[in-house]
Structure formats: structure tokens, C-alpha cells
UniProtKB/Swiss-Prot annotation:
This protein binds to 23S rRNA in the presence of protein L20. It comes from Lactococcus lactis subsp. cremoris (strain MG1363). This is Large ribosomal subunit protein bL21. Part of the 50S ribosomal subunit. Contacts protein L20. Belongs to the bacterial ribosomal protein bL21 family. Transmembrane segments: none annotated. One of its GO terms (biological process) is translation. Pfam families: Ribosomal_L21p. One of its GO terms (molecular function) is rRNA binding. InterPro entries: bL21-like, bL21-like_sf, Ribosomal_bL21.
Length: 104
């Protein structure tokens, strides 16, 4: 059984294991560089470690593959009988990360 971990990044919790690909909120790291996640909440596998609130000494190392934007989300608001409407679009930026190792 391979090691897996639950990390905190971008205000969200993500389950990761070696070789997995995750999409997280945009990180200020160039594509091709490595990124280390220090906020590890849980480590599982042959042994289990639960953080209170974080697991001491545990890190997750990944490599940034690319940056991009998600599909556009369109919001449309209108007021009936008032000839008033508003259309707004939003594309959330993300970072694609390939997990290289889970160190507990």
C-alpha cells in the first residue's frame, strides 16, 4: 500500500499520493520547478499519522507542470420590468501539480 496524505493548499484540503496530478489555486512558482507543501493534516499507508492540527516533519513534494485558467463561469442578473441586467464572467486561475513524493 502506497503512502498518501491530505494537504492544505489554497484554503482547500486535497488527498494526494505519489504520481497523482492535482489542480490547486494558482501558486507563485514557475512551471518546471518543485514545490513543497508543509501543511500536511494526515498521512496514511502502512502507518497512520493524524495531525493536531498538522503532522510534524511531514512534507509533500511536487513539480509544477503548468498554469492555466478554468472554463468561464457566466453570471447573469436581471430585474424584471426594469430594463436592467448585468452579465459577468470569471475564469479562475489554477496550477497543475504532479506529486513526486510523500515524506512522513
Amino acid at each position: 500500500m502506497s503512502n498518501y496524505a491530505i494537504i492544505k493548499t489554497g484554503g482547500k484540503q486535497v488527498k494526494v499520493e505519489e504520481g497523482s496530478v492535482i489542480y490547486v489555486e494558482k501558486l507563485n512558482v514557475e512551471a518546471g520547478q518543485t514545490v513543497t507543501f508543509d501543511e500536511v493534516i494526515f498521512v496514511g499507508g502502512e502507518t497512520t499519522k493524524v495531525g493536531a492540527p498538522l503532522v510534524e516533519g511531514a512534507t509533500v513534494v511536487g513539480e509544477v507542470e503548468k498554469h492555466g485558467k478554468q472554463k468561464k463561469v457566466v453570471t447573469f442578473q436581471y430585474k424584471p420590468k426594469k430594463h436592467s441586467h448585468r452579465k459577468q464572467g470569471h475564469r479562475q486561475p489554477y496550477t497543475k501539480v504532479v506529486i513526486k513524493s510523500v515524506n512522513a
